[in-house]
Amino acid sequence: MLNLCHALRGVRQFSCSVIVKVKCASCSIKLQDQDPSKPGYYTKPKSLPDSKLNPDLQDLKYLLFSQDIQLSKQAIQNDPDLKTKRDLLLRVICKRCSNALHHNNYNPEEFPESTLNDILNYVPRGSNVMHIVPFVEFPLHLDPNVLKRNDLDTTLVLTKSDQVFKDKNAVSKKVPIFMKQFLKNTLRIDSNKTFAISALKNWNISMFYNYFKNYTYLLGNPNVGKSTLINTLLQKYLGYKVKIDSTGKINSPSEEVMQEAFTNPKNFFKIQAAGVSHIPNLTRSGQAYQVGGKILFDLPGYSTSTSRLRLEEPIDERWLQRLRKTDLFNRKHIKQKTYESMKGTSQGGCYTVGGIFYLVPPKGSINQIVKYIPGPSKTFKNIEKGIDVFNSCNSSSGTHPLSRYCGIKSVICEKSQYKRYAIPPFIGSIEIVLKDIGYILLRTTGRYEFKGLHEIWIPRGIQVGIREPLENLIESGYQRYIETNGKESSCPRDRPIISSLYEMAPDEADTLNAVKKSYLEKTEKDLSARRFVDDDPYDLVQHLEKKKNPYWYYQW
């Protein structure tokens, strides 16, 4: 987004006149050196560089003197030239990003959340918008408020599809048909503008590029894959940052900078790339990119819930990095679907991954669990035992024999810090989705017999939902759609396929009746969604083969 010629022209004295032309290479905010309490601040060194150096280069190195960047050290050893000045300038990052990215000093208060209205201030009315949603956590992150806006031309883009499907065939052909009918049936949105992609696997990227229009904005929650998608496009179509002034004029990099795309493509891409990090809310300002013949805007992520828990508070930093780094996802789980078995017990036996959640099957049920969340799993006699063990792990500074299973901090090592949720009745398999964490597949085995509701205990503030297994749902729906020449919908109409869960009091014994009561309350203003309201709950759950997914209701 910098006009490099202007940025490097006439730099003689170190001052804010230099900095105001430079944005942080990580979060895109304007740099300043006057007020440490304000965004964009960077730290001056205590001592000056060698005064014999070219004065222009000295000023630029002065910006990076206190930052732990290997490239600046290497440049100081070499004879300075214009290229070195440009490289140093383009790699300047603010103190906030430097601390978080290079020194593991992360203060959540310095990464404030934005609302949808905050981000829409960057987007002119009538603009082309790509609503970015990670398919792996569908339907979480999907925002009907974006899709229903009449003042935007919106396309739904489902990222991280490689974490759901074995190959891109379903992603290319089957997902768009399914989503068109899902949006129409569930949200009354009539749209055929849906793309499922994988930026890491390069699935459908060419199709996506051919589709999106000039001057398109990427809109979505933090860490949904916007910057990763942009970087894939930059590499594939030789893209770069540009600056657009108030008159709409596009200021592109100089001819010298563009020449480096051919002489040193790795360095060129490193300079032009969008800032990708596992840290949420890292991007703080819009950034324009020239991708082929089109302009694409990367926007900061926005949050939809004011009560959302920052995962940095309860979850161990190393575990959190594994959860958030998409490239660490092990796709063998998609292909092999290796499961763990667990039987429900009278003591409340539970299954957990790191203490991030506790799944409690009903007594006597036999369950298979396929885990798509990084980290080792563990079963305990009950939730209290699990919390007690993880509390000991935190107290022992890593010396406890079960420390490798602990992914939470001491702040969450109390049962009162968790919410108890009842999962509405189901038969066969479901997927439990935890926002910004991942999902697990839960399957009950043997001949169906209602033994009680499954429960899951989750730290307060983490959003959770369930869905029918997504890959099977789309594959079987597509087959039905093709066999009937499109007469039957690929998305089921006879039942809901997604649902929120129902919060229960810790001492609630009759969870089934409590679920029905909550269901009636949630659907009070959506009567058309109600099903089986006249049935006795305990009679209803005896016939789930015919009356599927009772009390399923997703609250958008």
Curated annotation (Swiss-Prot):
Primary localisation category: mitochondrion
Q: Where is the transit peptide?
A: 1-21
Task: Write the record's keywords in alphabetical order, separated by commas.
Answer: Mitochondrion, Transit peptide
InterPro entries xref list:
G_CP_dom (IPR030378), GTP-bd (IPR006073), Mito_lipid_metab_GTPase (IPR050896), P-loop_NTPase (IPR027417)
Q: Which GO terms describe its cellular component?
A: mitochondrion
A Pfam family recorded for this sequence: MMR_HSR1
The superkingdom of the source organism is Eukaryota
Q: Which residues form the CP-type G domain?
A: 113-305
Mitochondrion as UniProt keyword: yes
Cellular compartments annotated = Mitochondrion
Q: Which GO terms describe its molecular function?
A: GTP binding
Q: Which family does it belong to?
A: Belongs to the TRAFAC class YlqF/YawG GTPase family. GEP3 subfamily.
Biological role stated in the UniProt entry: Interacts genetically with prohibitins and thus may be involved in the mitochondrial lipid metabolism.
* Name of protein: Genetic interactor of prohibitins 3, mitochondrial
Q: Which organism is it from?
A: Saccharomyces cerevisiae (strain AWRI1631)
Gene designation: GEP3
